[in-house]
């Protein structure tokens, strides 16, 4: 019996020694920390993209400051002319876009979070012009006179470059990574504005219509203005082969200092490489 026990102990020790000498086949064991069958998204990545965008630009009241500058402070016409300028409405612009992106992902099991810099180029040009028929006001103003007022008001915004710095979070499902993102939006725009105000006044309605006009012109132009705002959106990526992946996403951008209320929606597709 003693010999049998000793023989079994020796055999077990030999087997353990052989197992310790065998190589660790990492590919068979799988990466530590990731679910079986889930792609490893951790690390740096870069890529290119192209898409189609739609911009909505609301120019209502966008020339109010220029009107006040043209008329001067405390002018009795300011409120009336600015109300006419409110006829500036919304302009829709559609454009193709292209650009690139770079970022870094961290991964815990199936959860992926990261930060990304994204750039898009596309000409979003919007122009609004208001030129109503001169209006004769049937009640006198605070100066005791009747006024006939005309206005030509124009404003143009051209956005050519957009960039976003965004945080994103996703959940890996097999070879796919659906995600959401949000962050800071930056852009560059050329903005031009002009107004021409005409005023005729008299002691009666007919006199104001027949009087010689007085003109108040003003214009302004800003080239390469830095825009800022915010972005949000959703997307998904799919690992194709090796470390090459494809992506599709929708992005919303709103600029708050573009000389108009600017909202841009883009849909895009791209290819990237994870290092």
Predicted regions and their residues:
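Gram-negative outer-membrane beta-barrel domains
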Residues: 2-275
